[in-house]
């Protein structure tokens, strides 16, 4: 991926209008970008593609989590609106563009992982992780880059989200491998892999998982128990832990209870703990923990 110090200004959505398309590039100094109607902590470093029939518009951004000094590089669409415009242009009207943003809940969870000072977040060093409903993969990348995870599998039902997560892992210095190669001996950085994964359907994974991570996964009471069963199956061999970050105020009442009840029925002990906010503008976040240890 290009790492040229280019920058663009992405105008915010105003008066219901969608954002303008990105120019191909501008050789100017880095500047703040506006994403999805609010200011982001992301700095656009390069325009990678303006979009075509195969790939949406993509930019490379850098961001810092909490007090960490080292930046994380990510590859992503410039905004949810920009991705939706591309979906419209390519005739994919049933697609969900929400994966194009690093949402506040994921930012808070990733910050807690990166800073490593929250005792309610399990020790991820040398652990084999899977991020469920990963989207852009910010939580998993923070675990790999900042917490010393052995490996991370990004799982999502959207192939383009996995493409971006693995591209981000690569530009952030991770080793990108196939799921079947995660168990191979290697040195250096964490290994990252990706897989299409729909928790509403029974599936097996060709890798052992110690910890399942997720953010903003509990939005449908009808599938909350299915997610719990999926997570329980993923950590069954290792008697591992599941950690799902969610807004303190539920978006759909009953999701959290359904998830916790299903985890308890599967033999887990559960708890809910608060997470520090990534910034003052972010809403309160909680961590839903289920442990089979």
Predicted regions and their residues:
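S-adenosylmethionine-dependent methyltransferases
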Residues: 2-293
């Amino acid at each position: 991926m290009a790492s040229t110090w280019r920058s663009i200004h992405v105008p915010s959505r105003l008066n219901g209008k969608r954002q303008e398309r990105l120019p191909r590039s501008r050789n100017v100094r880095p500047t703040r970008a506006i994403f999805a109607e609010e200011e982001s902590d992301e700095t656009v470093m390069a325009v990678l593609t303006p979009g075509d029939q195969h790939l949406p518009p993509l930019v490379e951004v850098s961001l810092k989590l909490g007090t960490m000094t080292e930046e994380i590089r990510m590859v992503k669409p410039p905004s949810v609106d920009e991705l939706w415009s591309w979906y419209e242009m390519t005739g994919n009207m049933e697609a969900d563009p929400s994966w194009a943003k690093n949402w506040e809940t994921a930012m808070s969870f990733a910050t807690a992982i990166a800073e490593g000072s929250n005792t309610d977040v399990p020790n991820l060093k040398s652990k084999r992780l899977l991020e469920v409903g990963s989207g852009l993969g910010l939580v998993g990348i923070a675990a790999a880059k900042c917490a010393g995870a052995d490996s991370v599998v990004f799982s999502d039902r959207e192939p383009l989200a996995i493409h971006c997560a693995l591209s981000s892992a690569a530009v952030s210095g991770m080793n990108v491998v196939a799921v079947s190669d995660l168990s191979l001996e290697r040195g250096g950085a964490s290994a990252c892999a990706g897989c299409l994964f729909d928790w509403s359907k029974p599936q097996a994974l060709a890798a052992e998982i110690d910890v399942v991570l997720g953010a903003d996964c509990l939005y449908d009471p009808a599938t909350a128990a299915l997610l719990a069963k999926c997570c329980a199956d993923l950590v069954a061999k290792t008697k591992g832990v599941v950690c799902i970050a969610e807004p303190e105020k539920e978006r759909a009442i009953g999701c959290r209870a359904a998830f916790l009840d299903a985890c308890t029925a599967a033999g887990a002990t559960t708890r809910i703990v608060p997470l520090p906010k990534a910034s003052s503008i972010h809403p309160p976040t909680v961590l839903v923990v289920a442990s089979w240890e």
